[in-house]
Amino acid sequence: MVLSLILQLSTLWPACRADFTPTAPLASYPQPWLGAHPAAVVTPGINVTLTCRAPQSAWRFALFKSGLVTPLLLRDVSVELAEFFLEEVTPAQGGSYHCRYRKTDWGPGVWSQPSNVLELLVTDQLPRPSLVALPGPVVAPGANVSLRCAGRIPGMSFALYRVGVATPLQYIDSVQPWADFLLIGTHTPGTYCCYYHTPSAPYVLSQRSQPLVISFEGSGSLDYTQGNLIRLGLAGMVLICLGIIVTCDWHSRSSAFDGLLPQQN
């Protein structure tokens, strides 16, 4: 009796899940596109809308988050797109999202192919970028050098700064998670750092990169030699002063000693 009941329930289980569990999609069911407004990188407390757009009219849309088996949200519509609203997002709502859609004339449990994966990042500050010199931080005098500022998120705006200068030297909007800044001519040597941020409001700024020193070939050894000469010169002056003090002290002691000797008649 118990075994029979278990078998009956097991046959009903797929039917219960068929309406919301995507099956292996067929090639004839093209994938939708998933986007975020105002951006995929936002600060906490912002309202975010995820839009799932299908290439054809659909009946039901489903939004999925990585790590969850069932849809996070469902929307029943009769057009090509559905909007999923995430109110006052928190860092915990960040993650990987994708969406699917289905039509009324599709079989039970048949969903479209999954959309592109959208990475939603909710943070007050973006991770620190790296700054490297290509081909290297030591270049021939007058040669050009390229500085690559690399973050972790594509589609950001990058700014290159020179230490001691308040305004950015160069500014680049990049579709890649990095940007290359070209430094030309004799003004290349110096210390540089970079930032990146979201290209539109609400702006989220990264931490500053570690400073990078660019120098010409031979300038480091020349500075080192000059430093040694300065140190040797100071040491020589100290020795001369000590010698003068010792000599003066010896003369004063000698004169005092002569004064103590008895005078001969």
Swiss-Prot record:
- The question of whether Transmembrane is a record keyword is answered with yes
Query: Where are the annotated glycans?
Result: 47, 144
Q: Which GO terms describe its biological process?
A: Fc-gamma receptor signaling pathway; multinuclear osteoclast differentiation; osteoclast differentiation; positive regulation of bone resorption
Compartments annotated for it: namely: Cell membrane
**Claim: Lipoprotein is one of the keywords in the record:** no
What are the record keywords, sorted? Cell membrane, Disulfide bond, Glycoprotein, Immunoglobulin domain, Membrane, Receptor, Repeat, Signal, Transmembrane, Transmembrane helix
Q: What does this protein do?
A: Regulator of osteoclastogenesis which plays an important bone-specific function in osteoclast differentiation.
Name of the protein described by the UniProt record: Osteoclast-associated immunoglobulin-like receptor
Q: Which family does it belong to?
A: Belongs to the leukocyte receptor complex/polymeric immunoglobulin receptor (PIR/LRC) family.
Membrane disposition? Single-pass type I membrane protein
Q: InterPro entries annotated for this entry? A: Ig-like_dom_sf (IPR036179), Ig-like_fold (IPR013783), Ig-like_Receptors_ImmuneReg (IPR050412)
Organism equals Mus musculus (Mouse)
Domain Ig-like intervals:
22-115, 125-218
**Transmembrane spans:** 232-248
Entry-linked Pfam families: Ig_2
Task: Please give the tissue specificity annotation from the record for this chain.
Answer: Specifically expressed in preosteoclasts or mature osteoclasts.
Residues on the membrane's Cytoplasmic side span 249-265
